[in-house]
Structures are given as C-alpha cells and as structure tokens.
Amino acid sequence: MTRAGFPLEISDPERIPTARYYDADFYRRECEELWPHVWQMACRVEQVPEVGDWIEYSNLGKSVIIVRTKDGISAYHNACRHRGVPLTEGSHGNCKGKGFICPFHGWRWNIEGKNTFVYGRHMFSEHQLDEQDLALRPCRTEIEMGCVFINFDDDAPSLREQLGPLAVGLDAYNADKMRAEWCFGTVLPANWKVAMEAFMEGYHVMRTHPQLQQKVPILYNMMYGMDTGGIGVPINPNRSMKENIVDQVDHMQLLSEGMAGMCHAKDVAVARTLIDVELPEDPQQAIMHWFGMVNHCVTQAGQARGEPTPDLNRLAVETPVKSVEFIFPNYFLLPFLSSMAAYRIRPLGPESCMFELWSLTHFPEGQEPPVVMEPVMLPYDSDQFPMIPRQDYSNIPLQQKGLHAEGFDFMRLSKVIEGLISNYQRIIDGYIRHEPMDKLSAATQKLAGNFDGPVLDLGF
C-alpha cells in the first residue's frame, strides 16, 4: 500500500526540497501540525526563583505565563477568560500579592490560576462565572536541564521519554545545576530550519571557521578528508608532541574566545598548566592520555572551587554526551569540559527567525551571577557576537537567498555526516502526517548523539 504524501514531503532522505525553507503553505503546516505538539524550551528555572515570579514565553502568536507557585512551577495560557486580553504587562515580574490583573476590565487571578475578582459580578449570568471554567487554562510543563519546557498537547509523550538516554547523560553532567552567564539574541533573515542546520554538522568548519581548522588540522582532516582543496591546512607529521599539545590548548582558547560559553576560560587555564606534562611516546596514546588528564584536572579544579562539576572522565565512559546535542525541535546544547553553550531558534515567518544563545556553567553555591532575564538583542552582523556564531550568521542569510535560485530544487546531503539534517526534517514530516506519537518519540530519541552522524531509519 502506497502512503499518501503531501507537497514538499521528503521522498529521498539525502535530498531536502528547498521550498520547505520558504514556502508559505509548508510553513503553515509546521505551525499547525508540528509546534502545538512538541516540547518547547520556555525559560530557565533560575528566572523564576521566588513564589510569584513569572516570565512570559511566546511563539507563533501563542503566549504562556510561567510562574513559581508554592508547590513548584506552573504555566498558563496568557489570556483573560473574559475577552482574551493578555494578563501580563512586560516580559517578567512578580505577582505574589496582587496576582494577574487584566488591564482591560480588571478581572483578577492568583498564581494558582484561580479567579479571585470579577468587576460587576452581578451583571453576569451564573454559568458564565463557573469557578472551574473561569480558571486560567493550564499549559503542560516539565523541568529538564535547568529549563522549563512547555507543550500544548496534553497527550504528547513526556519530554523525558522523548530525550531517552540523552536525559541520563545530561543528568550526569549536572546540567540542571548550571546557570546562565549571559544571553544574546538576534533576528536572522532566514527560515528557522536554515538557522538550525548550520549547527548540525562540523563539516563546514574548514571554510567557515578557518582559524579552528588551521590550529588543529589533524582533528578536522581526520574526520572530513585529507584533501582540503588548497583551502585548509594539511596535517604536519613533523610537529613534536609538545607542539601538538600547544595546538590543542590554543584551539581551546579559540573556542573560548569564539564561542565564549562553550569552552570556558577557567577550563582553558587548567589545560595550559598541563602543556609540559610527561606523556607516552606513541602520539595517539599521548593525546588520549593528555585529554584524560585535562578532564581529571578540570573536574578537580571545579570541585575545589565548590562547583558541582561532574567527573568528566567517568562521564565520557559511562554516559557520553556529544559536543553538539540537538533537542527536537529547536534547542541545542554544546557541552565542552565543564560548561555549555545553548541555542534556541524560534520561527518568526517563512524566512525569518529569532536566534538566542546562552553561556552556561557551574558556580559555587551562593556565588551565582545575577539572573539573566532577557537577551541582549543585537543585529545579526554585530561585532559584539563571539566570532564563531558571527561567522555562521554571515552564511545563513546568504544561504536563504540561494535557496530561491532557479533550478535549485533540493539540497543534497552526505548520508554519512549530514544525517542529522535529514533525520530531524523527516520527523517534521512525521508530525505533518500524524504518525503515532510513540513512533515519533522513538524517532526523536535517535537524534541524540547524531551530530556529524548518518542518515537513520526512523521507523516510519
């Protein structure tokens, strides 16, 4: 039996129809068939620390209030039950005493979502003011990785189920204990999927981030090919072991400066102290031994400062986490040693999106920085962005323009190292086709560790 398709559905997993990145009808399908049924990262837990603290999350015209109650964290659809006006003014605040007050007619709700006041109550029919019906509509929430996630679908599998084994790895990383140092945001003139796919493979490093490939060509050439077409730097077999170690530290320094949060300066400082350590003569064993020492010393240094740094060597063996982990449909974590960068991408239209990035790390208890409540918004070409995302941002708008080229009907992917792009795109198709939720959840689990990975059989 042949499955009935829909326009722009992927038929060849190595070829992605380009109109999926700008077609208005396909964008409408995503808005209607995908986004109402997926887990969306709404805020960080530290943004609502005290009872009554609230923050608004919005996406595709839907607004949700996340609020700290006496019993935990709740979320409500941000609309007055009278005539639909949003209840919040501003993006965040505290309503412990007054609750949520509609700016239109003054109706009021407490932080548990219960209506506490209706002006001119006697003028309304009794059934209009039924207590249960008048309560704010709750929105489903789960807390993972130090973040509050929301889902508009009460029947969707749990976020924990969707994450699968990745949840265990992130737990071991103590991701829930990390705090944001800063957050930047920008609006990119590109489809949200174009913006995300720039971070789903490392194959672009040689050309887009040449400073990284030039520093440790052995790392990138071994993964993507020795012949760099005269653009990248070839491997130099004559470099001494110490020179190679210095290159690794310098590479970390470039990541620290270029990605800020991904490779933290405190970890680079530890690595620098290990440049002159005694190592095995075999180069491959020496590099592995050196990285093991870096893991150990970063762990020890963090714990000595009172930070909840995990045992990085044990983590690498028992619950490994890739350098880029994609959490469907629009959130990334990029762990490196003790810290992480995080990305969230939200659609603003068929060819526009909001891109936010955070620097996350551990702090000793009581020494956490001030809570970051809003991103610092910058133009996408601002030199205030770290170098590496700035280099990526320079390509993204160009790619969006190129997708409209006459005769360019599909993107052609490597089935070996660009599989993550194909895999998550076909999961979007699964939502549009209304595949069973258990199959979608099982397919989504396969995205864990799929960075630079192959095209997979998703089971539908």
Q: Where are the predicted features?
A:
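Generic structural signal for secondary-structure transition and capping sites
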Residues: 35-39, 85, 204
